[in-house]
Amino acid sequence: MPRSARFRPFLATAASGALVLAALAGAGPASASSAVPATLPARAHGLGDLIYQQKPLRVATYNLSLNRGAAGQLVTDLSTPDDEQAKTVAEVIQRAAPDIVLLNEFDYVEAGVAVDLFRQNYLQVSQNGAPAVSYPYAFVAPSNTGIPSGYDLNNDGTVGGGDDAFGFGLFPGQYGMVVLSRHPIQTENVRTFQNFLWRDMPGALLPDDPATAAPNDWFTPEELAVVRLSSKSHWDVPVTVGPHTVHVLASHPTPPTFDGPEDRNGRRNHDEIRFWADYISSPRSGYIVDDAGQKGGLTLKDSFVILGDQNADPRDGDSVDTAIDQLLENWRIQDPLPTSSGAVEASAVQGGANATHQGDPKYDTADFADTAPGNLRADYVLPSRALRVTDAGVFWPEQADPLFRLTGVFPFPSSDHRLVWVDVRVPRFRL
């Protein structure tokens, strides 16, 4: 089915000024007859130019696979400017030049040591003639990956190892994440949800042991008292853009695979995605409590962008059927549908599972195994409707492009994921 149906823009033309103002205040969706595409031609927009800041804000997400197999190895690799993978992913970021970017699979190191080294030795140094980029603001926090739970969460009869951690990882912080920004981060207002328990989500899709008649009993009551929802964490990182605040909602749900018939990872992936759908939807957010004890989610007046490798494709792959639809079909969210010609070419050349996919390959963001699951749309930049989308794309060059060397084919010089970016115009005033 055509993907364009998912993009249900809310902002009306400049002539409908009252409707635009209502949208920014968090009113309900416009009727189909009054809505127009959020990506508009480059021209004067009258009232729209009075409402929105002139310069677009480029927001991106990038699973750069800058994880290592042992604690401390990433710091060692980034301590010099010579790590080839780090140079390559840094050049990808320099070529895309986002103002705000979420980096997934960047090992957490206390005090932000690895982040500082990556900025100093790679991003702030021109790679192959690409303009260096500077991100004076960064947010990094612990991840659930690799933290021992003390329980046999995968029910294999032993306690310990990555599968029994709160999030899969060989050491604490493996596969962590980072937010980098050219605009000030309101550090004092950041909210994290690392410790939120899965059982505390109403109607959670808790996994079921197929060997018993009882429902949702994969975990024991003792395990449910400690099992966390986030496989890494969920972050609400407010960023100041002019007089306006944009909430960067960052996460990296677990892959919906590497389990059994209980589908514990598929169900967790679904609920990790659902968390943001509830967080932006008052009063559904009432059950949410952050790590500091503050309850609730965003208000209807708050602007936001949901970022991250969600590990869920709307048409293909192994995720629960409606997992990513919880965001793509949420009335507060725009789906800019970023595309690339490189993804189309890769699908055709690689074949395999790609040949049987239902989704259009131009939306793919990850180059996975050709046998299964094939290439998928896994990475998302989803702005709220109070932001005006002007452009979007996926950094996936075709093979004939000189920049194809940055993405390549397996074994990848950078990552099996591609950087996804969206340009938005932010309101000029506080709501």
Regions found by a protein language model. Name each.
Residues 38-42, 184-191, 196, 200, ...:
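Metal-dependent phosphoester-hydrolase catalytic domains
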Residues 231-233:
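Residues that define the transmembrane beta-barrel architecture of outer-membrane proteins
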Residues 64, 105-106, 183, 253, ...:
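Active-site metal-binding loops of divalent metal-dependent hydrolases
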Residues 176, 249-251, 307:
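Generic beta-strand/beta-sheet core signal
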Residues 244-268:
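Active-site His/acidic residue clusters
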Residues 63, 139-142, 184, 194, ...:
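Residues at the C-termini of beta-strands that transition into short coil/loop
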Residues 8-12, 24-179, 206-228, 237, ...:
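N-terminal, active-site-proximal structural segment of metallo-dependent hydrolase catalytic domains
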Residues 1-17:
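N-terminal export and membrane-targeting signals
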